[in-house]
Amino acid sequence: MTDTTRSLRDCLAPAKLNLFLHITGRRPDGYHELQSVFQLLDWGDRLHFTLRDDGKVSRKTDVPGVPEETDLIVRAASLLKAHTGTAAGVDIEIDKRLPMGAGLGGGSSDAATTLLALNRLWKLDLPRATLQSLAVKLGADVPFFVFGKNAFAEGIGEALQAVELPTRWFLVVTPRVHVPTAAIFSEKSLTRDSKPITITDFLAQQDCNTGWPDSFGRNDMQPVVTSKYAEVAKVVGWFYNLTPARMTGSGASVFAAFKSKAEAGAAQAQLPAGWDSAVAESLGEHPLFAFAS
């Protein structure tokens, strides 16, 4: 990342994985109560921010299917500007590397990186708690990325406790299908009554020797997604012939953990054509964590 008084270049918006995802209930407002552990990855979109003196917020990169006015990046910058009353503006460029509709948190991570980066570039010095309160208005996953640590999440994903996770390498495979989160949450067959657990339940069963917490939990959305999207089911099936794997979020990405980059790369080399993939190392902290106190 390059940091000058006028710009911030090459800011990572890291992907996340849900090491497990349990749906424990549904609130009167329609939102689902969740429990999950979020894992940050050293892989994601790259954002570039350049200061403007005219107060305007402008996205300089076209993102297919995402109009500028509805882009979470622009919404995050505009929200921060409105909250603080700053006269500063910004040009934002994005190198989009994460697939959309994949359960990796790409748009939410972009929004969080925007909040953190502009907190520095605009010299706002807002505390993390304030940025998180703004993040809630942008989406359920955005507060986690502003929180900036691997976390045990509850509620709709906004109640977060930092958790230490072992360093490991992940192979993330994404079939070329878009899974709409809202549609999966509305499915009648979706499990909505998983028994609540505690953070100590997860930590006690983590298998740090193998580097994969497959002894704990599941993704409650996975059976619904694999029943409706054959390509996701194929990826899950391919992985289970090799190593334990799990879908992240509402899909479509499926991941497995490995002890080393070499092991993950060897598995990646066996993938059939037509699936996108990435090998990524776990992160313990968001790269822009220091941009808020």
UniProtKB/Swiss-Prot annotation:
Family: Belongs to the GHMP kinase family. IspE subfamily.
Function: Catalyzes the phosphorylation of the position 2 hydroxy group of 4-diphosphocytidyl-2C-methyl-D-erythritol.
Protein name: 4-diphosphocytidyl-2-C-methyl-D-erythritol kinase
Protein origin, superkingdom: Bacteria
Single GO biological process annotation from the record: isopentenyl diphosphate biosynthetic process, methylerythritol 4-phosphate pathway
Any Pfam family: GHMP_kinases_N
Coiled-coil regions listed: none
Residues the record marks as active site: 16, 141
MF-aspect GO terms: 4-(cytidine 5'-diphospho)-2-C-methyl-D-erythritol kinase activity; ATP binding
Reactions listed under catalytic activity: 4-CDP-2-C-methyl-D-erythritol + ATP = 4-CDP-2-C-methyl-D-erythritol 2-phosphate + ADP + H(+)
Amino-acid positions noted as binding ATP in the UniProt annotation, renumbered to this chain: 99-109
Pathway connected to this protein: Isoprenoid biosynthesis; isopentenyl diphosphate biosynthesis via DXP pathway; isopentenyl diphosphate from 1-deoxy-D-xylulose 5-phosphate: step 3/6
Keywords attached to this entry: ATP-binding, Isoprene biosynthesis, Kinase, Nucleotide-binding, Transferase
Annotated Gene3D superfamilies: 3.30.230.10, GHMP kinase, C-terminal domain
